[in-house]
């Protein structure tokens, strides 16, 4: 099954798992160059990047409940790209702060 075939709920669930579990687990081990370690920091960076600014100026809280299918898909893809090293998390974090 590809990301394109997933429902909005499945995409959001995958995004939450990646930012709450996968990325925080990778940060102190194989991705020590990442500037953040905590789940809420990964979520802030991903959401700010998707929204093109401070996420809470664009989405009601909690953000994950208000993501469109397209936004959830973009969030999952961005997480995957960050993990793969094809997107610079350091630069995204700077833009987000």
Please place each PLM-identified region on the residue numbering.
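Positively charged, phosphate-engaging catalytic surfaces used for nucleic-acid and nucleotide handling
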Residues: 1-97
């Amino acid at each position: 099954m590809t990301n394109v075939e997933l429902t909005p709920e499945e995409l959001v669930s995958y995004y939450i798992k990646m930012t709450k579990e996968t990325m925080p687990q990778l940060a102190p081990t194989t991705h020590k160059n990442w500037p953040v370690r905590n789940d809420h920091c990964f979520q802030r960076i991903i959401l700010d990047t998707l929204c093109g600014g401070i996420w809470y100026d664009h989405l009601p809280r909690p953000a994950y409940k208000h993501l469109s299918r397209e936004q959830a898909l973009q969030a999952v893809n961005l997480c995957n790209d960050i993990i793969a090293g094809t997107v610079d998390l350091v630069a995204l974090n700077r833009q987000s702060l």
